[in-house]
């Protein structure tokens, strides 16, 4: 998890130990990632969801639901970056499913601070 569209830069959501262009090998990310969903839930916004591009039906369902809700909505969508991950583009769907299946990136919804 990083800012892939700006050159694989570290973000507060980048996991501990991750490599990015702004965290060189000798200085990998030394702090745990921020739990962005928990931060949003603490503010009791109307809708928070996590989704993965490996499960497009779930992603579309949550996007549609978010569009129908008034107020602040937060979607954290996991999409592997072949350049940042040094992986093959054809493995993107497989990788995005593996992170969910192995509990690295759980998919869920939170409404008004309550997890479902």
Predicted feature locations:
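Thiamine diphosphate
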Residues: 1-73, 89-90, 94
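Glycine/aspartate-rich loop-and-adjacent alpha/beta segment that forms the canonical ThDP
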Residues: 59-116
